[in-house]
């Protein structure tokens, strides 16, 4: 999709059996205090990373390269997954992840692996190039409906 003439990639590249295996494979990373729950952990650097996780990273890099490389102003070196981590979003919790962006990252990749069937929510995105008017309720935004298996890749400058 080109939202605001900004390339946002949405795909569902994996089937349910792969997603089931992925969920099973990452359980050890998501236990309280496990490496996958810590922001300083780069999961791509962990030893013995499950093949399903490597496949997710490879697919994100493949799609980013396929759709973003033709849009760049200058030649790019080979792309790679620079940092990976998990986020668990708990509905109705006091703690919320604040709107943020990822500086100069070319592509930010997200995959939703465990999503409630009801009220899954939306990924909200603001493109700061159009001017984010924080005090104005009419600041333009886009929303992407979240569902299991959805992979979203967007430029790092998108506030989400």
Stretches with model-predicted labels:
Residues 1-77, 85, 94-96, 122:
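Non-heme Fe(II)/2-oxoglutarate
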